[in-house]
Amino acid sequence: MSVNQKFEKTGSIAYLCDEYLKNNFIDPEASERLGVKRGLRNPDGTGVLAGLTNVCDVVGYDLVDGKRVPTDGKLIYRGIDVEQIVRAAYAEDRFVFEEVIWLLLFGSLPTPHQLASFKQVLEAHRELPKDFAEDMIMKAPSPNIMNKMARSVLALYSYDDNPEEQSLTNILSQSIALIASLPTIMVNAYQIKRRVYDRQSMYLHLPQPGQSTAEHILSTYRADQKFTKEEAKLLDLCLVLHADHGGGNNSTFACRVLSSSGTDTYSAISAAIGSLKGPKHGGANHKVMEMLGYIMEGVKDHSDDTEIAAFLRRILRKEAGDGSGLIYGMGHAVYTKSDPRAVILRRNAEHLAVEKGFEDEFRVLCAVERLGPDAVREVKGTKDVCANVDLFSGLIYRMLGISEDLFTPLFAISRIPGWCAHRVEEVVFANRIMRPAYKYLGHEQEYIPLEERG
């Protein structure tokens, strides 16, 4: 019996909702009046400084005389511009996500010997514990892969003979094992979801030796286990660009908050997955693909900038699209002139888009990137808006034949190295539980004995 069915049997939830709304209200204007930093953001849009980190920096503006000045965006992993990492990967024709994992965790670039050894360690941890897939995934499937991934991470606590210890040795061991095994959990959860909820055939492939993380995902996801190197490199690029985004993004901050309490690695990473599952954080590329469908249908000439710009203005006026008034894939809390991840994805995805028959869709998204800022300025009066990484990532996954069920889970696979790096840093160096304040606004009332209540 579902939760809703139980309420239908025992009493109406609508009555309880009415009771809540009758007795609870917070005036939105009270936050400004009392100096509350809603969303932990300052009035100028900058984030409230909540901690220190060596892991990652996100640069989207300069502060000049206390004011934000737009600048081209940069994403910095341990002091290295991600643009440099990506250019090296393509120049040397190799996969670099594993190198980025090392860089984020340890703060240095691995030597060839260190990288080769580290890849072997990751490969050794890809296979799940004995009977784990059967007991923890098959017997309790979920229609939502993020939900199943979070539950599976928590379940791995029971397979660890020392889950609670907070030593650097233990946390790093747990982190590396989770980074390696989470892609296998994701694909297993998806295949079983296909079988149980979609009534389609499932394919459970074992990890193959000598593969990068991107190759491992494609070979276990696809029925025939076949893929091209160009496909795997584009997925590797997506993993690299999503690997971290500073300590203040919602899921990483959630991981750091839990880590500050002294809880175990499995609880902290599961909480981060739960945060990323939220549509305000990790689900935007779904909405971009939905919006792209509206544009492809509503615009007659997909090469006509004037027609596309007019349609974007209609979206902003809530006359087209899903009625939200939002151009999905546009705007970011930090980036102002450009999101380097979007720039890099656009630059490297075009060839495969043409090859896979998605040239029209790709060019429409490029037009949205180009025309969107002016449309937002004209309709909303908002300045400093640029395309973000979500504008192109969803189409890339579709080009790779990846189900939308896995769009956000792939984000989690990408981001877990960052989560783990921030967890280690929080435990080793911060060593103080996070405990911000909340202002009480409730009114006083007298306790009334039960028999006297009307």
Residues covered by each model-derived region:
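Non-transmembrane, aqueous-exposed alpha-helical and coiled segments at domain scale
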Residues: 1-454
